[in-house]
Amino acid sequence: DDKIGTNNKKITKKEFDYIIISPGIDINQCNLSKFLKKNLRKIYTDLDVFYNHYEKNNKITITGTNGKSTTAKILYDVLKDQKADVRLVGNIGNPVLSEKKVTNSTVFVIEASSYQLEYSKLFKSNISLILNISPDHLERHKTINKYVSAKFKLVKNQSKKDFAILNTKNFYIKRELESKNYLPKVIKIEKDIDNNFLKKIDNKYFDTDGNKENLKFILKVAKILRLNKNSLLKTLQKFKGLKYRQEIIFNSKKLTIINDSKAT
């Protein structure tokens, strides 16, 4: 059937130039599944529309199974404290198409899920971060390979002048890098660690393994952007984390209580 519609009104597929799909829609499980599968080349995402409108703006995009929101918020705070016109959008902050009064100097920090990236065709980021990958959302993606591919759309669409910051100790990230050639400059968080700077950070929030890892990503971005280290240190010292995500709710010499109830 080449027609879709509700009630008595039918619309032919020829009337569509583009289909902007919501991230929550799985084309394999929806009422329009047959129609959408026939028209995959016409499907775009909100990230694609966003990129088409703000192609010249600097974009830093974070994805991964865990730690996306926290890392995005730290990076947003860091850039804001450095007096940048920075916007926090995507899965955290405002929807990507809701920002107003955007100028050429506006920087976007974007949290992107696998759902948002899966069908994207145009979107690309100047700096991409893949924090980690572990089996998740397989009810949607069906296989771990498809889930990894959705995450790596972020890197696949980048050019040689872009940066991909990756945790190459992660099994799935390492395997993907070894099996394909990607264009951007790959920066491994395990390499060239600024231990002298790390020693200056006196914030118990970064004592957990996950947050130590997130911190390494922040430092790599800071190096690429040549951020002021004194300002960076001040921001990191005062960061308290997001609620329910490795949130320290009590701390003493003998006991630390962490609320990580957001963890899935």
Residues covered by each model-derived region:
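N-terminal leader/targeting and accessory segments in enzymes
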Residues: 1-45, 49, 227
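Beta-strand->loop->alpha-helix junctions that form or flank phosphate-binding loops
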Residues: 3-6, 44-49, 181-196, 233-237, ...
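General beta-strand structural signal in soluble alpha/beta enzymes
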Residues: 6, 42-46, 86-91, 109-110, ...
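Residue-level signal for inorganic ion chemistry
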Residues: 19, 62, 91, 131, ...
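Walker A (P-loop) phosphate-binding motif
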Residues: 36-40, 46-90
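Conserved substrate/cofactor phosphate-moiety recognition/catalytic segment
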Residues: 84-104
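Nucleotide phosphate-binding/pyrophosphate-handling subdomain across enzymes
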Residues: 85, 204-264
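Flexible active-site lid/hinge loop adjacent to a nucleotide/diphosphate
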Residues: 102-188, 193-207
